[in-house]
Structure formats: structure tokens, C-alpha cells
Amino acid sequence: MVQTHSEVKRVEELRRLLQQASYAYYVLDAPVMEDAVYDQLYRELQQLEIQHPELVTPDSPTQRIGERPATQFLSVRHNIPLYSLENAFNVEELQAWDQRWRRQVAPTEAEYVAELKIDGSAIALTYENGILVRGATRGDGVTGEDITQNVRTIRSIPLRLSFDGIENIGKVEVRGEAFLPLEVFKQINEERQKAGEQLFANPRNAAAGTLRQLDSKIVARRRLDFFAYTLHISGMDDASIANTQWEALELLQKMGFRVNSQHQLCQSLAEVADYYRYWDTERLNLPYMTDGVVLKLNSFKLQEQLGFTQRFPRWAVALKYPAEEAPTRVENIAVNVGRTGALTPLAQMRPVQLAGTTVSRATLHNSDRIAQLDIRIGDTVIVRKAGEIIPEVVRVLKELRPVDTQPFIMPTHCPVCGQPVVRETGEAVTRCVNASCAAILKGSIEHWVSRDALDIKGVGEKLVHQLVDKELVHSVADLYSLTNEQLFVLERMGEKSAQKLIEAIAQSKNQPWSRVLYGLGIRHVGSVNAQLLSEKYRAVAELSSAKQSDIAGIYGIGAEIAQSVYQWFRISANQRLIERLQAAGLQFANTEEISAVDNANLKLVGKTFVITGTLPTLKRDEAKALIQKAGGKITESVSKKTDYLVVGEDAGSKLEKAQTLGIKQLSEAELLKILA
């Protein structure tokens, strides 16, 4: 059917009216339209779009629900990483954070924005030309899952932004928290109970689970809500938009987002402390759950100067409330054995509700902690969730102790393999040192196949336990000689599954030297340290023959890690493991750097680069990869040792510092010319 001009105009008018009504109802909580009128206009719009499908747009109110259920969520890379926040658990730790950031910059006065920390699930929204084009889960902060179909069902998230008073808007990135109001959470659990379904433990878990539903109609019925708290706009001068977090929150509201109304601008830490104490009790009267206060430096200029650590922004902190505590009874003390052989005592307790979750186990850390607590089987203890995450026993109520209890003694032999355990001088941890211990082997294989190591898909804890228990593998090297016939004896392992697993294992042979090094599980060597070591020692032969003092001299390594690495390579069993893995085809050298191309042909060897701002065509990771492939080194901060600063749009304090130090600046075009 051919559309008329009047029909096009009517569709636009209906969308405008419905969007205004939704904003007033869901965001402002101030309805401007009767439900019957809204329904009538909605049906009229729906009918016009059915008659003229070409008029349907992604921001239409009719597009919030009803799409075909997804079969899976696609992994997407965030345009701007979603960092975690550093935690503080009291005012003293807050003051320590304040002192740390002040040491990074010249003495300055600062304002703080205090916001309630909503206990939900973080999501990232992307708008292009004012239209919502993507919603994604936080994931690991770098990559998340595309949940756009589900995000559209959240009524407090605008499908089209309002840009009154703002011109030439670019791509808009908004971060916020999706959550379930307590009343809605209660209703959902009542419905699940009637249906005989498992109840959600808390609103946070329910919100996270809802966002990952494949059917958006289910998401719509769950009635998630959303508070926006972070705004990024590309393609514009930041100063023309907002100079502060406070201004950004105001702008988010103008754009059509719901912003938590309880935020406060504070001129001092004393005001922050008052805000924190006030909401410690008042938060219990809110219609949603909170688990602390997020504190941010108000000035964006100051935020840019401070930057980020590897995990946190230096300019923000999460001030958590004291963890919830409850009494319960210790029914047993078990001892777990980890991949490094560490014996960890674990209190098995009568289940108790803490912070909305059921807790039945708590770590006791080591024998020193047990002695300090004097904890015994049968004791009544106070358990809390430290940081709302890790349950721990904080004290024993000895006045309630049964008369027949006995002090707990750490085993002298490994509870898994039966071999004697040792406790090295100066260490609090007791360890099994039997390299053939099944617990150590299982842990080492689980570590080897993990995402940050060799990232072998389809190898989980249950499969690892089967492989070890059936004696199919005695080290990670045995994974590379598994056959289909061997795998057929495992539970739920058919011909296709076995072949798929063998292919995944074979594919891991292409993982780089840094991942292999991390996968070896050397004590104290995390993924970042493995990267540093692999950059310095480009092949295993170089690292294994390096002096301990040379290893310790690498920036970010230090004496403890160096000693651990040096000693690991002195053990003959580890030397044999490397030989077997090399024979299997694993990468024990940086093949891109040590190849037929020698250093003479690597144009950027010995040069240090810093990148700032948004480059015209290259993503930052792409620029880094090109520089590193040519032998250059990337660092995050500008110093006298920096050779080049690659400058894009919206460059900040790094450019100023480079100009002060006389460091040469390159545009993207100039960088590509050098690389050509």
C-alpha cells in the first residue's frame, strides 16, 4: 500500500506523543496521559506500521518487544572499556584513596559527586544519530554480550535521545545499571513459586539473569528499570557538552534518561562521610537495593589527568557499607587442595542468608587463621560477606561452644594423595609438594585451559576430573596426545563431541608464547606478568637461562616473582614438561618478532610510543598492534623516555605533557607513513 503524506506525518506525531508519555510515566513518574488514551494511540500507530512496514523504525514504541527469540548472544567489544571500581569499606580507607590520587597531581581543590551504588547489572548503551543501536552487558569490561533486543524492553531507556539545545551530536555512549525494583522482584518470585520454579536469590541475580534471556518477551514481563550514570559523546568538544560529572548527569536527564535523584555534590570528604552515614540506614527505605556509594571527582579535567590503573579509574572509588553478618553453626571443616598444592581449610556451615544469598561455606584461609580464631567443629560463629562477595568467619561465640569440641589440626598429609605436606619458613600456607597429586594435576589443567591461558573451549571442571580420574592425562602435555578412542570412555562423549574437543586442543597450539607462559602456572606469575616476561625474553630458552637478578630488574616483576620463575625452571620435571609441549607444537617463542625478519628490518625497534585521543580510522588496539609488530613499545603514560606521541581527536593532558617535554607528535597519517 502506498503511503500518503498525511500518514507519514501521523506516524511521526504518534511516536512523539507516545515517547513523551513513556518518558513522563517511566522516568519522571508523573503520568501525562490516561492509560486508555495511550493504548488507543499505540494501536493506531501499530495499525499504520502494519499497513506501511517501510515506516517502521528502530526507535518506534512498537519495537520494544515482540522480536523473534535469539538463539545466542553475540560477543561485542566495548568502544570504551567498563572498568571496575576500587573498593573502600570505611571512611579511613576512603581517606587513604583521597591521599593516593592527590599524590598524582599538583595540589588542588576538588569537588566530589556522591551517587548511590545501585545493586543491579551494568550495561553499556550506544546511540548513533540519536537512535539506540546497541546494548551490551559489562562482561569482562572489554567485551560483553549484545543484548540490544532485551534492552529495548526497558521502558526507562529511550530508544531515541532528546537533543534540545545540543547541535551536531556524535556517537553517544551511556553506562548505567539495570535493576529490579524490590516490589517487582517480590512479585516475580511469587509467580515462580506458584509455577514450581526455582526462586531468584536476590534482585541482582534476577536482573542479570533477565538480561541474558534469549526471549525478549520474558524480559519485558520482568519489568526491569534503569539508572544512567556515565556519558561519553564522541565527535564533539567535551567542553561544549559537560565539564563535570554533575553536568553530565543533568545532560543525561535532558536526553531522556532516568538518573538516580539521590546524588549529591560534596565540597569535602567530611560531606561525603555524612552522605555515606545517612544512606547507611535510609537505603533500607528505598524501593531498590543498594550496596554502597560511588564517589567520583567532579572535574573531567582532573579525571583525565589522573587516568586509570590496570583495573580501576584513579578518580573514583566504591565506598561499600559494612558487610552483613549472621550467626551460624560450623558442621565440618574440610581441606581443599589447589593447583599450587596449597591446603585451604573451609568451614562447612548450616546455611544462612547473607545479603540476599544463601551461604553454607566460608574460607578459613590457613592454619594461622584457624589458631587465631580457635575455631572448632560445632562452634557457633559470626560469618559475613566481606565486600558483599566472599563469605568469611569473623569471630567465634565461645560462650556457646559445646563441651566436647576439639581444636582443629591441619593435616600432616595431603587429603587427596596422602603424601606428607610442608610449610615453608615464613609462609602461612601449608602445601602438598607431590607433583603427581590428583588435586594439583586437576587444578593445573583447569588453569591451562582457562580463558586467559590457552583458552581451550569445551574443557570444563567436570571433564578435567574425568580425564584425571580415568588416568587419561598425567600432565597438561597429555592433552595433546588424546585420541577419539580414549575420549569415548568418558560420560556424554560421542564421536562428534570427541572430535570437536580434539580440534579445540589442537587449535590451542597457535596461542602465543605469553599465554603459554601464563598457562604453565608458575607461582606469582599472572597474565600481566607473563606478558612482561615474554616481551623481555622472547623465547623459553632465554627465560630459562636468565639470571634471577636480571628477571627481577624487569619493571613490574620484582624479587619474589623472579625467584619463583628462576626456581621453576631449575626443576627437572618442569624441564621435561616444556620439552614435551615443544614437541607437541606449542609456541615457546614470539614468532612474529623472531622470524626471518631480523631487528634491522623492524623499523620501530627501541622506540617507545604513547597514544592519546581518538584516531580517524584506526582503533587504538589496531594502532598498538601495528607499532608492536614493527618492534615498537607501547606505554600508557608520557615521560622523558617516550619517543613519540600519536595524537588523535580529543587529546588531553598527555599532549600537554609531551609538548612540555619536547616529545615529537605524530598524526595517524604520519604513523602509517613511518610504518609503510
Swiss-Prot record:
Enzyme Commission no: 6.5.1.2
Positions that bind Zn(2+): C414, C417, C432, C437
Regions annotated as coiled coil: none
Active site: K117 (n6-amp-lysine intermediate)
GO BP annotation list: DNA repair; DNA replication
Disulfide-bond pairs as recorded: none
Cofactor: Mg(2+); Mn(2+)
BRCT domain ranges (all copies): 599-676
Catalytic activity: NAD(+) + (deoxyribonucleotide)n-3'-hydroxyl + 5'-phospho-(deoxyribonucleotide)m = (deoxyribonucleotide)n+m + AMP + beta-nicotinamide D-nucleotide
Keyword Zinc found: yes
Purpose of the protein: DNA ligase that catalyzes the formation of phosphodiester linkages between 5'-phosphoryl and 3'-hydroxyl groups in double-stranded DNA using NAD as a coenzyme and as the energy source for the reaction. It is essential for DNA replication and repair of damaged DNA.
NCBIfam families assigned: dnlj, PRK07956.1
HAMAP family: DNA_ligase_A (MF_01588)
Protein name: DNA ligase
